[in-house]
Amino acid sequence: MKRSTRSQRPQTRTLVCGLAERLMRQPAAPYFEDATRTEALRFCVEHGLPAAMDTFGNVFVRLNRAPRQRPLVLAAHLDHPGFAVERRLGPRRFVLQFNGRVADAYFRKGARVRLQPGHVPACLVRRLRGEERRFEFEAQSAPEVAPVFAVWDLEEFVLRKDRIHGRACDDLIGCAAVLATLRGLQQRRANVNVIGLLSRAEEVGFQGALTIAAEGSLPKEALVISLETSKELPGVRMGGGVILRVGDKASIFDSASSRFLEEVATELVARSKGFAFQRALMGGGTCEATAYQEFGYTSAALCVALGNYHNSGPRARIAAEFVSVQDVSGMVDLLVAVAQAMPRFGALTGKLPRRLQGLLKEARQRLALTLRA
């Protein structure tokens, strides 16, 4: 880990927390991202950031003040593990299917959700036999509007000291980082070529990202950086800074791009107040960088350490997720610097080859001189 000892820029923290709250107060599940997407688009309209949807409902936000510059893509997803309502059994009884990855032990009788729309409280009654991840729930009262999905009944957003707690840090924190970075670059009038990408249905197999990659919706020469919250694992520490994610459970990401991120981060440590970073392979899950990489895009990743991953709390109880505000603010500060450093990609990534060539020259000389017959 690398760290500066001074305090972080307060404006980044304020922007990050404000965006995180706006997004996290919206209910979302795979295929039901309307509220989070609407809030993201509303922010873009408020600040004059050009945004559009593709035919699959993924959001593209573009800040292009340097058209000849290599595009930088910042990718996050709008959904979080949740339930789809499959059918109604009675005035207050519903069958719900869970979409996402959570261990079976967490689906206990009495587990509470909120049916959407309407935020109607409901409790898990039983697991349906022979039906994978399907459960019967009973609502506290008969919903006035037919529900179509449900989310865990947890606090939406709470700021406690330096931590954001809420139902869906994953990956609305990533979405907040995308938008905060674009806004920061816009305020600086930076000459950058950045595409913010907010995809759908990541929790059920990167479905939004796969449609984007397969449709060729991004420039092939782009550098794609996946932004995530990732399960805290040994070797990284919450509050220790943004994590340069060199790989995930399925893939190792582009070496030169990871080196570029580290070079920019190292420069930022030297000049920034309170910036810190860590470097690790985060194998707790698979992120969208794997999907983009498999379709031929040069990909890298950043993440922050996540507590209660996918709402999996202690003692097999559903609980709010949490992240460090300092880590997320550091992610945004790094991304702002990365976007502005894109013209120096070759120079920064060329440092290692140049060092190795210097070592090679010395090696040839020293080895020849010390050769014993």
Give, region by region, the residue ranges found by the protein language model.
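N-terminal hydrophobic/helix-forming segments and targeting peptides
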Residues: 1-373
